[in-house]
Amino acid sequence: MASASRQILRAASRASTRTAFAPAASRGLAARTIAGRRFYSSSSEPAKASSSNLGWIAGALAAAAAGAGYWYTQNGGAATLTKPEFKDYQTVYNDIASRLEENPDYDDGSYGPVLVRLAWHASGTYDKETGTGGSNGATMRFSPEGGHGANAGLKAARDFLEPIKAKYPWITYSDLWILGGVCAIQEMLGPKIPYRPGRSDKDAAACTPDGRLPDAAQRQDHVRNIFYRMGFNDQEIVALAGAHALGRCHTDRSGFDGPWTFSPTVLTNDYFKLLLNEKWEYKKWDGPKQYVDSKTKSLMMLPADMCLIEDKKFKEWTKKYADDNDLFFKDFSAAVLKLFELGVPFAEGTENQRWIFKPTSE
């Protein structure tokens, strides 16, 4: 749980009226590590229950003694649920949030944004024409996909979640990575993101081809091609781009460098405000083409970011979100929900059975 003082500071950071170059008011549980050339931008299968009659009996007795509404088996000292419920996933959420709070040793003080990026990149490979890719499979565990340039640096996020997977072997990597993204968004004071489990893990044969994720060095034609392939429209593209309020780029991953906003641990509409209200110029350096703010030269925008104010249709939504954080949150939540569920063969009739997890700030 975050301390009361940190929660107050973070809430104040979001609620206060900011000048364009005000320093971040909060560092809390949120995080600042989105990197890799993206636009927003080796593990085993889950353990299975033992077939031992003795293990089954011991597990059943233990569950009965605990008053549990499900049975489990003992597998290497870890409980494997057969019918996990909302409360079980809330427990996993809470443990992810605790790890975010207890591990401030990553980029800018938290792993939050890199967890969002992991969930995003696991989902953003979807192709509606072939029905391949998406968050179902967690195929980034394997070298073909994990080694794609757009996924550089995401091993840190996958490794961060490994202790959670070991503690709760009943959750698939696919569901865990998305739950990690949901948790990170909410713990960084973003909107509530509805969640439903049901993803399964696949082997390396299901890895998607390289090139399905956005290239931040490109402009609106490329951006539309990538997102239209997944089934998004212009409004949803701009809403999803708002995730660039979080984290930063790294020269050793994407080649780009710097954060998009001054408060990269709190999700707000500042990204859109800065795009519209600040003057941007090409950065003078030996790296790939990117922009810096003319005043402080401490913020950056990528070519794919700039198309949100260069393209007439994109700019319309950029203005709307800059003017209305509540509207941004509403549309961002809906677009992220759609992204995280692309290509997942959920059981029929579960569309209205999504869960909302309680953040640690409540």
Curated annotation (Swiss-Prot):
The record marks 117 as: Transition state stabilizer. One of its GO terms (biological process) is hydrogen peroxide catabolic process. Binds 1 heme b (iron(II)-protoporphyrin IX) group per subunit. Its main location: mitochondrion. GO terms for cellular component: mitochondrial intermembrane space; mitochondrial matrix. The lineage of its organism: Eukaryota, Fungi, Dikarya, Ascomycota, Pezizomycotina. Belongs to the peroxidase family. Cytochrome c peroxidase subfamily. The gene is CCP1. It is an enzyme of class 1 (oxidoreductase). This is Cytochrome c peroxidase, mitochondrial. Residues 1-40 form a transit peptide. Heme b binds at residue 244.
